[in-house]
Amino acid sequence: SLLKEDKPWFAYVDLDIADQAEENYIKSLAEIDQQIDDTLASVSLDNTIVIITAEHGTTFNKLDEKARENYFGRDEIQVPFIVYWKDLPVQEVTKLTSHTDLLPALMSSIFKVKNPVSDYAQGRNLFELNGDPWVLASNFRWNVIIQPDGTQYHIDRKGNYKKFDRTYTEQSSSRPPLGLFLDVFKQERSFVNK
């Protein structure tokens, strides 16, 4: 069988959970858990890296389409992020992370790449986080800096600015933290320029 042969094998399962009531969502999660279990039972974990994550979370807030597209509440941006490989020690990362942190983790910890992370990725190694003070999320309109305490700073291309606290309540703030935005965009631009 293809799955038991000693050849490289890759699988990508694109699961799309429709916008449903909470109880149907929970039922869908149980079905996904079973699909993951079935998939893992069909491959040899001796030479397999398993990564389980999601593009975004699910909010049950009543939002219209435009509000949903621009929503960065914790329920929407916090996702599962599980990495398994037989030679990785079991650990739980509780610091603020981003999907951009996966590639540096794989390249440094599994594939033993010695180049500086900045040569090939924007993120940080998940397994060697050193307390960086923010992650960046974005959509077609907003760039959002998220700090470990949950504070979010949103800015768009037209200079529109919003600040939210950890509960995603908009805060009164007339001046964006320009130094922080400049640091973030400088770091992002330095990677693109390479």
Each model region followed by its residue ranges:
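A long, amphipathic alpha-helix that forms part
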Residues: 2-9, 17-50, 64
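Extracellular/periplasmic catalytic domains that process cell-envelope and extracellular macromolecules
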Residues: 3-7, 45, 73-77, 138, ...
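Structural recognition of the beta-strand scaffold that forms the well-ordered cores
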Residues: 10-14, 52, 83, 135
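Catalytic metal-binding/acid-base residues of hydrolase active sites
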Residues: 16-18, 56-57
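Extracytoplasmic/periplasmic, Sec-exported soluble proteins
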Residues: 21-31, 73-74, 91-98
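Feature representing long, continuous alpha-helical segments
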Residues: 30, 34, 38, 79, ...
